[in-house]
Amino acid sequence: MAELIEYYGTGRRKTAVARVHLRPGNGKIKINGKEYKSLVEYLRGNEVWEIEALKPLTVTSTNGQFDLVIRVNGGGLSGQAGAIRLGIARALLSYDESFRPILKKEGLLTRDPREVERKKYGLRKARKRAQFSKR
């Protein structure tokens, strides 16, 4: 049996985690076991998130060269799109290390550290307080 060639990368954003497998192919997308024509279908019609998520493939000119097999969970669609983007970028590095300067220049290898700030007791939200009255 022929050995399956596969390149793997993990991406995280907010509370979303994406495990991305790149397989040589023609651009098919499979997310959580379900086939999609494009990422827009999974991201409920938001083309901006699709463009962002597929940016690593665009900047390295590898669009349509790989089939994407993605397992993503946690967070909302925006966080999942960001996690997929980082996962694809890291998987591309395992495919070809010469992509590193291109991906780094575009900022695609950096994990976005921004998380939701926790709510503090005595406050309405993380920072919102009740109105202060001097008298």
UniProtKB/Swiss-Prot annotation:
GO terms for molecular function: RNA binding; structural constituent of ribosome. GO terms for biological process: translation. The keyword Ribosomal protein applies. Pfam families: Ribosomal_S9. Gene3D superfamilies: 3.30.230.10. GO terms for cellular component: cytosolic small ribosomal subunit. Keywords: Ribonucleoprotein, Ribosomal protein. The keyword Ribosomal protein applies. HAMAP family: Ribosomal_uS9_B. Belongs to the universal ribosomal protein uS9 family. This is Small ribosomal subunit protein uS9. It comes from Petrotoga mobilis (strain DSM 10674 / SJ95). The gene is rpsI.
